[in-house]
Amino acid sequence: MRVGWAVGPVDVIDRMSSILGHVGAWAPRAEQVATAKLLDDAAGIQTYVTEIKRGIVSRLSALHEGIQAFKAQGLPVDSLSPEGAIYLTVRVAPFGKKTPDGKVIATNEDVRKLLLDRAGVGVVAFQAFGYPDDDGWFRMSVGAVSLRDIQEALPRIGEALRSLS
């Protein structure tokens, strides 16, 4: 369960409050007391935040470096250097190539399915965020995976791309 707060325009907060009033999603008293106590521990919070950031940077860097290594090997991929958040912007564009079973990769959906089915990796196409083009741009999250997960996934991604002809 999460304990949190929101800050924003009065009309937005009022609408949020009216929704929450009907959801019954209030945090139990024990969690509220524990959160209040935690907020008094500035050093503890800073240590926690520092560790979280360090882990995110490590995972983003590993994923970016892996994608760039594939690019250097001539695979049809690229990634933008991470600048924050928990997402890496990647381009996976093997358009026109065929899967081992003869399917031509023609759309971002084809790429998404290839990575999911052959590498066990989920990606979100930029179309989900309103980007109109079907040109291989995706978002990959490192928020819920470990460094080891990334290190194990990269070879599978490479194998999936190398399986195309």
Model-derived features: where do they sit?
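PLP-dependent class I/II
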Residues: 1-165
